[in-house]
Amino acid sequence: MSYDGYVDGITARLSLALDAELAEATALRHELHAHPELSGGEQLTRRMVLDRLPGTEVAEVADTGALVRIGGPGPAIAVRAELDALPIKEATGAPWAASNGAMHACGHDVHLAAVAALARCVHRAGGPMPLLVVLQPREETYPSGAKDVTSSGVLPRHGVRAMIGAHVQPVLQDGLVACDGGVVNAAADEFVVTMRGRGGHAAYPHLTADPVLALAQFAVSAQQIVSRTANPIVPTVVTIGSLRAGDAANATPDIATARGTLRTMSQTQRPMLQARLAEIATGVAMTHGCTAEVTVLAGEPPLRNDARLAEVTSRHLGGLGLGVGGPLHSCGADDFAYFTEVLPALMLFVGVGDGISMRLHDHEFLPPDHTVRSTARALLAGYLAAAEIFGERGLTAECGDLACR
């Protein structure tokens, strides 16, 4: 048997086994979507997924997360799926829509169902390497669940050689998968800037030190970080999402607060941008007779896909009937980035629309059910590629014919 023939054979076998799991996976997706749980409270979600997974080796991780090993001892390939939902009131009108004020508006229900389908497929049909399923909590908030998983040491203890993840992406055409090497998502830090002034009657501004005016100038001046501090060829974003000050129209408050996000695709540029943000806040505050307090909450690093893993996965995607789209790089962030810091890893972006009719984190976000199939196939492509690269004898581990190589 030739090497290519063997690869085609195992791909066909696993593809058929995967398709056999899709009805069960779709039912799981509906159940998960109807019962979303917020970050840190994903116990029911974890139980619903674990009840559908094979494997006898189950361990808790990161408080409400879990690890499930499929296959025997030895080096393994890991796949990640996120457990948490968002505090959004759903308005999709689906028969299985959530009604508890939370919502799977970022596709985590699809990711979980796809990972469950892959795990059952590998268990039933056999795979080239053991599979470690990582059910990760707290992707949408801090502290990061992925960071807790990596710092716990469980991945090296399970002999994990590579990590695969997938995320639905409405800006990418349905049926396409973006599979790029290098940095594909930005580092993301949150910041809080508090301007402290001297309040008083709005009719006597000369007797006050106005923190609202100081905060407004800061909000405008902070945009100069992008145009005058950041390297112009490195994608950088400063967005202020919250401004809060006072309660009365005729009174100047003592305090005004801004909250926002600072994002860059350069890890080395990150400390410089944080420092410049603080300098601008302090300088603007002094100009207005106020003081500034700046707190930066460091988030995930840039997400850097392994180039070799991306290259080989692209080939397997074609063999599984998926098109390769992209490149797709954005200043979005995902704590999957922590996995890319400690081992070869790949995040795949699975197209679910036309970029117009659906948006992530929107109360009407609802990818079609067939997205479970395309996401599961994308994960299968990554799993096969990782086994080919990092397996002790590549995909020929089952071949039995050294001429395959």
Residue ranges and their predicted role:
Residues 78-80, 191, 347-352:
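Non-cysteine beta-strand/loop elements that form the S-adenosyl-L-methionine
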Residues 8, 15, 19-22, 26, ...:
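Electropositive phosphate-/nucleotide-binding environments in soluble metabolic enzymes
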Residues 65-66, 86-89, 93-103, 109-110, ...:
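Histidine/acidic-residue-rich, glycine-tolerant segments that coordinate divalent metal ions
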Residues 32, 79, 108, 133, ...:
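Divalent metal-coordination and catalytic microenvironments
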Residues 1-30, 34-36, 371-405:
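N-terminal hydrophobic/helix-forming segments and targeting peptides
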Residues 216-405:
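Metal-dependent amide/peptide-bond hydrolase catalytic core
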Residues 5-105, 109-129:
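Acidic/His- and Gly-rich active-site-bordering loop/insert found
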